[in-house]
Amino acid sequence: VSLCKRRGFIFQSAEIYGGLNGCWDYGPMGVELKRNLKEYWWRKNVQEREDVVGMDGSILTHNSVLVASGHVGGFSDPMCDCLLTKERLRADQVPAQSGMGFFYTGAAKKDGSWNIEKKYSVLVESEKQADKARKTAAQYYAQLAGKDASYKDMELKGECMETVTDSTMYNPANGSLLTEAREFNLMFKTTIGATSDENDPNATGWLRPETAQSIFCQYKNILDSSRVKLTFGIAQIGKSFRNEINPRNFTFRSREFEQMEIEYFCRPEDGLRLVDEWLEHRLCFYDEVGVPREHIHILDVPDGERA
């Protein structure tokens, strides 16, 4: 990342104000690199092919479009929060853990300055780590009380121990109890119109989570207005947005990103043959832009795991 910044390829968005996590600004070198890649992709996949046409769809997306596609109801991840650090984790990625659970009903400062009645628990490897569990619990209750205190300065109430087996209710990093899982929508929602009601579905809009939906919506118009017929494709390059919980891996997992996409329409009986043809076409393209095919892993996704 530091090399890309020094050479003028990419910078953290709003860096002088602390940075906007998951968003990046491309500098003089980066914007030229992107432009070259997009122009080459468009030339190879649209201009040099007779079976692919292009379009440029709106970023703002009608609520009904994403209701119909299943995004409004299902484009979400189950999330839970660490009660101690407030870190947000994917609930379905928390590993099952076993060990000794220390359970508490509350805590109070020994001098009587505060008292909290709230259940909490900590998971440690064994009873021998009792001090670690108590310290974690003390940190949790001290946060609730708004005070900086150690377990030596407070009384932990109702302590009991119990063997815990294959539980996904604890943060693997520190043993703290997690909140119950809840669904977290991964799309950016907005309201359309100056006097719009955010609870009115007709005034609700979204920043598109992918470019595919506008292609599907305009399929009939493109079919009627262009000299195309099955089998053919529609290509699009454009921005998409996803409210990633934990943006990571540099630009790979970001909240705003650019896609180059082709939706290819064919008769069912031609599908498998065309997949093989397009696979070879893509491998040749990547090789041309400097990614040798021996560096690419081709994964055959089983039917039950496909989106």
Briefly describe each language-model feature range.
Residues V1-A307:
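TRNA-recognition modules of translation machinery and tRNA-sensing kinases, especially anticodon-binding
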